[in-house]
From Swiss-Prot:
Family annotation (InterPro entries): MADS-box/MEF2_TF, MEF2-like_N, TF_Kbox, TF_MADSbox, TF_MADSbox_sf
Coiled coil: none
Role description: Probable transcription factor involved in fruit development. Key regulator of the transition between the state of 'ovary arrest' imposed towards anthesis and the fertilization-triggered fruit set.
Record keywords, A-Z: DNA-binding, Nucleus, Transcription, Transcription regulation
Name of the protein in question: Protein AGAMOUS-LIKE 6
Sequence motif: Nuclear localization signal 1, positions: 8-15
Pfam families: K-box (PF01486), SRF-TF (PF00319)
Protein's UniProt keywords contain Disulfide bond: no
Motif (Nuclear localization signal 2): 138-145
Organism of provenance: Solanum lycopersicum
UniProt main location, coarse: nucleus
SMART domains in the record: MADS (SM00432)
Lineage: Eukaryota, Viridiplantae, Streptophyta, Embryophyta, Tracheophyta
GO biological process: positive regulation of transcription by RNA polymerase II; regulation of transcription by RNA polymerase II
Amino acid sequence: MGRGRVELKRIENKINRQVTFSKRRNGLLKKAYELSVLCEAEVALIIFSSRGKLYEFGSAGITKTLERYQRCCLNPQDNCGERETQSWYQEVSKLKAKFEALQRTQRHLLGEDLGALSVKELQNLEKQLEGALAQARQRKTQIMMEQMEELRRKERHLGDVNKQLKIKVSLELSSFEGEGQGVPFPWSNCNASLDEAGSSTFHVHHSQSNHMDCDLPDPVLQIGYHQYMAADGASGSRNMAVESNIIHGWGL
């Protein structure tokens, strides 16, 4: 028959309890030794009996294992900081290497430092440049087509606005012609003003003759608008009086 399952509870009999402790202690120490040998693990085992007696096992020494345990468990913040620093250092190293590679690639694309490249690397570089040039030309053509389409759209919009304005002007002209009124264009007033100004530009005024005085000079030709006639007339009359006195002086 198989061995039955042992019920896990305190053994009341002191002799049986001591025998069980001895057997299981030896088995536990044996298993710790086997684990350290088979798996190359650092094992430390400490056992205190019910009477306070110490039993221990350490594959690398109890003291050394305890010191290592204290460094790992009693100072977790320091360990975390050290691990974080190491992680950041590795990340910086990776980024630095990537940055140097990108700088080297950029110099190659600019045609610099090509002496160290092989024929195959130069061919790959040539293909990259041709691909980049093709993409740049394609993008430029796309932008030009978009600009042309935008200009065509604006042209169509302006054409529609022009047609609407022509229709509106035609309707207004038709309404004025139907009512028998003149066309109220701004330039019609300008033409009328120009006609009036042209008709009043040249005026010939004969001065009044005095039969009691001697013969006066020939009629005076005055050129200008009506608003300047008053001032010119006053100055002209004064000049005529002076000339009349001179003529009378010669006559005497």
